[in-house]
């Protein structure tokens, strides 16, 4: 079985969609479960977070260090994206609450 770093390198070097798909399959449960926990159980927001995380991985894969542990990077990036998403949600809810008062 090939490790995630090798699969990601195959995606970067050869554009292998199947390699990237395998990385997603291997780590989707981790990313989604962390997302659900951090967005307070909102499964729709968690799906948005997970999608953003994997899109970011695809976009940033070339710039990631060869020594980076994909699972660790995904966990940390999921925490970052979930926090950013929740800040945006709070701002949106505050705006909507203020509009209701007017």
Residue ranges of model-derived segments:
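N-terminal module of bacterial RNA polymerase sigma factors
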Residues: 1-30, 97-101
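Generic alpha-helical segment signature
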Residues: 1-4, 24-25, 46, 75, ...
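Structural recognition of an alpha-helix C-terminal capping motif at a helix-to-coil junction
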Residues: 48-55, 68-80
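Arg/Lys-rich amphipathic alpha helix in sigma70-family domain 2
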Residues: 59-67, 76-97
């Amino acid at each position: 079985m090939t490790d995630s770093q090798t699969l990601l390198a195959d995606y970067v070097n050869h554009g292998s969609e199947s390699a990237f798909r395998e990385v997603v399959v291997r780590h989707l449960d981790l990313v989604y479960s962390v997302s659900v926990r951090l967005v307070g159980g909102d499964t729709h927001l968690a799906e948005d977070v997970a999608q953003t995380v994997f899109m970011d991985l695809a976009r940033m894969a070339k710039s990631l260090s060869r020594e980076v542990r994909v699972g660790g990077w995904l966990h940390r990036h999921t925490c970052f994206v979930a926090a950013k998403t929740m800040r945006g949600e709070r701002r949106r809810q505050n705006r909507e609450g203020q509009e209701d008062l007017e």
